């Protein structure tokens, strides 16, 4: 797809799923045919890293730690772990580096340089997404998706069930 490092991140709303995600990150919950990580891997053909709570990072994060993603100078493409519909991802990957996608104020995704990533990785690792979003908005081009283009974001555990049928249909081409 591109020359990016693909990174899924948990945001503050992981707490809504606390009973389901004590031993796994939010991006490991299945909705439709895939988990968010499996879906992104199937869509891009790339290895997908994850940023999650510190007690899970050793198992689900980058092997050498989050800051190892900066070592080779490739840009990062960040994807919110609550996003189920990834139709917007190709546009973000094709956008200029340092572009941020917002969905009604929520950080949906970003294509960022390693320099800008070094300023926000701490916030992402700590699920302080509001701070990361504010920092990204200071230095990057911001795109607020119009209502018609907004993807489905899971917000509560029952969304995994509610969105499952629709998501299976979206996942069929990736199977």
Where do the protein language model's features map onto the residues?
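Terminal amphipathic alpha-helical/low-complexity segments used for targeting or macromolecular assembly
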Residues: 1-175
């Amino acid at each position: 797809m591109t020359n990016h490092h693909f990174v899924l991140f948990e945001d503050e709303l992981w707490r809504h799923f606390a009973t389901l995600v004590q031993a796994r990150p939010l991006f490991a919950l299945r909705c439709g045919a895939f988990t968010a990580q499996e879906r992104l891997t199937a869509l891009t053909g790339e290895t997908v890293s994850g940023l999650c709570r510190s007690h899970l990072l050793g198992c689900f994060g980058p092997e050498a730690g989050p800051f190892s993603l900066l070592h080779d100078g490739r840009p990062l493409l960040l994807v919110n772990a609550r996003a189920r519909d990834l139709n917007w991802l190709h546009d973000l990957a094709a956008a200029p580096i340092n572009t941020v996608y917002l969905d009604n104020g929520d950080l949906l995704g970003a294509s960022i340089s390693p320099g800008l990533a070094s300023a926000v990785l701490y916030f992402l690792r700590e699920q302080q997404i509001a701070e990361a979003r504010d920092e990204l908005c200071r230095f990057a081009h911001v795109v607020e998706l119009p209502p018609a283009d907004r993807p489905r974001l899971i917000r509560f555990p029952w969304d995994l069930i509610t969105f499952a049928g629709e998501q299976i249909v979206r996942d069929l081409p990736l199977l």
